[in-house]
Amino acid sequence: MLLLKHGRIEILDQNTMYGWYELPKQEFLNGEQPEPITHYIKQFPLMKDVNSLENKKDACPMKWFLLSAPITNHWFN
């Protein structure tokens, strides 16, 4: 699910409603991403089949890690 808040696009896991990737609206509309989003999915699966209490425990560090990465398109230069 895509959620627009404060000029940013956040992708949410529909089962837990925790955000796991966020980028500026204009960057999203221009189709510019720092890395293919599949890179993040491989590192951090959405945990659909895990207990919801474990999702809450793991979602905060996962979101912090993903959002602390700089958003730039210089990854492949």
Swiss-Prot record:
Name recorded for this polypeptide = Putative uncharacterized protein ycf15
Q: What's one Pfam family the UniProt record gives for this protein?
A: Ycf15
Instruction: Give me the gene this protein comes from.
Output: ycf15-A
- Does Chloroplast appear among the keywords? yes
Family, similarity comment: Belongs to the ycf15 family.
Task: Name the predominant localization.
Answer: plastid
Species for this entry: Drimys granadensis
One GO CC term, this protein = chloroplast
| InterPro entries given in the database record | Uncharacterised_Ycf15 (IPR019645)
Q: Which UniProt keywords apply?
A: Chloroplast, Plastid
Subcellular localization is given as: Plastid, Chloroplast
